[in-house]
Amino acid sequence: MPMGTHLFLFMLLGLGFYLISALAAKLIPAIDFWIDIVLWVGAAAYIFSHLSFMDGIVSLATMFYCYWTAMDLIVSERVEKPSGDWQEIELAKNKTRLLSDITLTAIVFAGAVIFFIYGPDTSPLKYVILLGMISGGGALVKRILNVFSVKVFYSAALEKLHISSHYETRTYPLSDLKNIQLESTADLLKLHPLLTMYSSRLDLTTSFQQVIKLSLPGETLFLTVKEPQKWKTILQEYTDAENNVDNVISVLPFYHRKNVKRLLGKLYFAASVKGVSAYALLVLALYALHASPWVMAVAVILYWVFNMYMSDRVLRAAMDAKSCHHPHVQAAADKIFRSAGISHVRIYETESDDYNGMAVGMNVGRSMVILTSATLTLPQRVIEGILAHEAIHIKKRDVLSSQLLRFLYLGAVVGIFLLFEQHITHPEAHKIALWAFIMAIIILFQLYQSFCSQWMEVRADNLGASLLDGGYKQMAEALRILAVRQDEDIQKQSAYSSEAGEDELQIDSLTRDKSWFFRLIDFQFAPHPPMYWRVGTLLSNKGHGVLKRWLRDRLKESITLK
């Protein structure tokens, strides 16, 4: 596997190709597409004529990854302030806030970087780490440029708030503002993207002064303004007074002794679940002890099993989940779980503007259901439908099953590659066939994951309906209301983007898509069947032959053009 200087050269080539492409698009747009084609075909021909097949694949993939990362980082020029009467809100800025982000990122990646420097060059893990560093480095660059460029404008006449930075441009109608709160300082453990999951937060904090938190449909905005109390008073006029918290919410620094447990839990999540630093250090330690590849493989599998066992605690820490204190929700959950024949299931809530609920834990005795704060605002019968759906996931051990099925597929792929290594002595003679095989493995993995996941979702919908007083009708109505709320938030978020222009995104997940291609994606690659299908089958089939119908419709909707 190419490493060191050679792989760094291919990274630079990927970046260079994007710069040439961007320059061509600006100077000679009529032929910029063909310039891209010539560059990539020429690069592929050169690489495969000078490197072995697998080294060529790795090198070309590295170039592609750097190309797309550069495309994400280099954006077109944005309008700093829209036309009209706007007042700039002065932001509090200091270097410490940005240095804290950089430090936490370095800590999370430390194990991976150590392995990349000292680990064996032949290890495929080095390539995985390299891609992770490219992605993480790109995200960090975006964060740095956002901090230096962010500006906030307010218009009393238009009743709007405008956010402008190098990568983020939003215009918010203040009529959409749900509530506004002040926090004593920036909560890094809540805002840093490597330490969270399923987050809809837009972190534009630029100091450790008081943070103004604005909740809007589908997203929450965090800013550090110089006069937070003044701007809270102004913006509070646009919200429902009942939803606002008058006092300043106390936030402890991430290094505070009372935050140590929370910090360690999030770092463990970042290093073991969201990243590979922990696995990298484990493999490096065994490599230093001259352990055999089989010992390394067994150790990695055992650590993976340990992480599955600890998944409930790890994810609870990552999501800052707290025990649910809504008596009506807890009472409904207890009733549903008794009907499902399961016990010791805890209900937690996490702060998020996404309408979502998830089952967590690898076995019934250590399971929990986490509901977002947005979900808890839904009608009671909708929450009951979500709880019933998650109860079936827990009863059928779907979280554990999905992990084992994924591991089974990856194990089969590794076995096939080992057979190839034994029986194909000259892979260069079968480049086209091997390339096609690798592409097939990637596509089949997506199909396989989607098939298993959708089967579990269909089962959870229909068996979950039997746990509800309203049966299939209540489950269908719960999914319908959930879909409507999700669609509304997506459309709002699209409208906030200044780049959306007049062609505002229209979302209706309860209507069958007219496009064959999007139906193919929905049924063959998405983790859930389309919502219109789920609601329709609950009302029409009522649990009878629904899995057969799903198999039939999965094929039919994927090949029918109309």
UniProtKB/Swiss-Prot annotation:
<dbReference type="Pfam" id="PF01435">
    <property type="entry name" value="Peptidase_M48"/>
</dbReference>
<feature type="transmembrane region" description="Helical">
    <location>
        <begin position="56"/>
        <end position="76"/>
    </location>
</feature>
<dbReference type="Pfam" id="PF23492">
    <property type="entry name" value="bPH_9"/>
</dbReference>
<feature type="binding site">
    <location>
        <position position="457"/>
    </location>
    <ligand>
        <name>Zn(2+)</name>
    </ligand>
</feature>
<feature type="signal peptide">
    <location>
        <begin position="1"/>
        <end position="24"/>
    </location>
</feature>
<feature type="transmembrane region" description="Helical">
    <location>
        <begin position="33"/>
        <end position="53"/>
    </location>
</feature>
<dbReference type="GO" id="GO:0004222">
    <property type="term" value="F:metalloendopeptidase activity"/>
</dbReference>
<dbReference type="InterPro" id="IPR056388">
    <property type="entry name" value="PH_YxkI"/>
</dbReference>
<feature type="active site">
    <location>
        <position position="390"/>
    </location>
</feature>
<feature type="transmembrane region" description="Helical">
    <location>
        <begin position="294"/>
        <end position="311"/>
    </location>
</feature>
<keyword id="KW-0812">Transmembrane</keyword>
<feature type="transmembrane region" description="Helical">
    <location>
        <begin position="432"/>
        <end position="452"/>
    </location>
</feature>
<feature type="transmembrane region" description="Helical">
    <location>
        <begin position="267"/>
        <end position="289"/>
    </location>
</feature>
<keyword id="KW-0472">Membrane</keyword>
<keyword id="KW-0732">Signal</keyword>
<dbReference type="GO" id="GO:0046872">
    <property type="term" value="F:metal ion binding"/>
</dbReference>
<keyword id="KW-0482">Metalloprotease</keyword>
<protein>
    <recommendedName>
        <fullName>Putative membrane metalloprotease YxkI</fullName>
        <ecNumber>3.4.24.-</ecNumber>
    </recommendedName>
</protein>
<feature type="binding site">
    <location>
        <position position="393"/>
    </location>
    <ligand>
        <name>Zn(2+)</name>
    </ligand>
</feature>
<feature type="transmembrane region" description="Helical">
    <location>
        <begin position="98"/>
        <end position="118"/>
    </location>
</feature>
<dbReference type="GO" id="GO:0006508">
    <property type="term" value="P:proteolysis"/>
</dbReference>
<keyword id="KW-1133">Transmembrane helix</keyword>
<keyword id="KW-1003">Cell membrane</keyword>
<feature type="transmembrane region" description="Helical">
    <location>
        <begin position="128"/>
        <end position="148"/>
    </location>
</feature>
<comment type="similarity">
    <text>Belongs to the peptidase M48 family.</text>
</comment>
<keyword id="KW-0378">Hydrolase</keyword>
<feature type="transmembrane region" description="Helical">
    <location>
        <begin position="400"/>
        <end position="420"/>
    </location>
</feature>
<keyword id="KW-0479">Metal-binding</keyword>
<dbReference type="GO" id="GO:0005886">
    <property type="term" value="C:plasma membrane"/>
</dbReference>
<dbReference type="InterPro" id="IPR001915">
    <property type="entry name" value="Peptidase_M48"/>
</dbReference>
<keyword id="KW-0862">Zinc</keyword>
<dbReference type="InterPro" id="IPR050083">
    <property type="entry name" value="HtpX_protease"/>
</dbReference>
<keyword id="KW-0645">Protease</keyword>
<feature type="binding site">
    <location>
        <position position="389"/>
    </location>
    <ligand>
        <name>Zn(2+)</name>
    </ligand>
</feature>
